[in-house]
Amino acid sequence: MDTTTLTDHHFLHILQLASSALPVGAYSYSEGLETLVENGTITSQSTLQQWLEAELSYGAIRLEAAVMVRAYQAATMDDMETLCYWNLWLSAARETQELRNSSWQMGRSLMQLLGKIQPEILPLANAVGNPCNYAIAFGIASAHWQINIQAALLAYLHSWATNLITAGVKLIPLGQTAGQELLLQLQPLISHATVEIMSLKDDELSCCSWGLSLASMQHETQYTRLFRS
């Protein structure tokens, strides 16, 4: 993957956008992981790794990432109609209320933040309106900052994996070293998934997400919860 065209300026932008310090509330979501730990499906570093590898290979994160790419392309061309289309498409593709609400909340938070620190992005934000999915907001920000699209996609998947590993470290629990080891082990698959997602055509967008959806639905009525999803 060629990301050598990233200048220092662009590299710093992608680091900021993918940072866990970005105030969008990602830390409060586990995407059903809390339920999977509660019911004994995920109990260790190895079972967490198996779950994340399956998600990267077949799961809903691939749809999100593919839509992020399309949002980036539409924002680059100021194609408001296409941008709105993919925002609605992704909202319809979310299978549970928690997953939909988390995407909307993070997207809204990112667009509000960008509107304050980069006011020139407001026309795009206003065109998409509310609710705005996080993948859409991330694509708009990456396009605005002229970040290499492959680097933006790599960062999107990496930040997703980082967030869920952090949740797993708290829930299972795991040590911090185990979490970093897992993130390192996922890097080849993240890179491979990036290449695959970049090549997907619109009519090839699909995923196998029934496990995620069932866990998310069960989480809505889980008695004790640390996370919002």
Swiss-Prot record:
Membership in a protein family: Belongs to the UreF family.
Subunit structure: UreD, UreF and UreG form a complex that acts as a GTP-hydrolysis-dependent molecular chaperone, activating the urease apoprotein by helping to assemble the nickel containing metallocenter of UreC. The UreE protein probably delivers the nickel.
Pfam families membership: UreF
Protein's organism: Nostoc sp. (strain PCC 7120 / SAG 25.82 / UTEX 2576)
PANTHER family recorded: UREASE ACCESSORY PROTEIN F (PTHR33620:SF1)
One cellular-component annotation, GO: cytoplasm
Protein name stated in the entry: Urease accessory protein UreF
Gene coding for it: ureF
Subcellular location, record wording: Cytoplasm
Top-level division of the source organism's lineage: Bacteria
Function field: Required for maturation of urease via the functional incorporation of the urease nickel metallocenter.
One Gene Ontology molecular-function label: nickel cation binding
Entry keyword set: Chaperone, Cytoplasm, Nickel insertion
